[in-house]
């Protein structure tokens, strides 16, 4: 769950490290829906994501905030403002990242996804 989440977050993150949760959620759902549409495994057999549950944005949002987001929040890499509907990257971490760093992170996530599903 971490790789699709991170890719979605990075794609929607603005210059101050914020991303609207609804935008991240849309891409996160689209990743798994695309796998279902192509007849590919979504994840492990115990994964709750299927054609029906992916239509329930509230459930998927809750799932996404529990795992994988919570893992990043626990390490204080990210935080979520429910009132603003925004997921934010820790500003100290953001300040250390260059555009090249973000490209390397995205490339690594894509490579890891390929390996994960092999």
Question: What kind of feature is each model-predicted range?
Answer:
Residues 1-118:
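Intrinsically disordered, charged low-complexity linkers and terminal tails
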């Amino acid at each position: 769950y971490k790789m699709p989440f991170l890719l979605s977050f990075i794609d929607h993150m603005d210059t101050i490290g914020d991303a609207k949760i609804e935008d991240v959620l849309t891409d996160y759902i689209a990743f798994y829906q695309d796998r279902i549409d192509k007849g590919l495994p979504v994840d492990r057999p115990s994964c709750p994501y299927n054609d029906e549950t992916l239509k329930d944005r509230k459930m998927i949002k809750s799932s996404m905030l529990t795992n994988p987001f919570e893992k990043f929040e626990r390490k204080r890499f990210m935080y979520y403002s429910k009132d603003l509907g925004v997921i934010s990257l820790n500003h100290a971490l953001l300040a250390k990242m260059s555009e090249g760093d973000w490209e390397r992170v995205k490339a690594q996530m894509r490579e890891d996804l390929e390996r994960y599903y092999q």
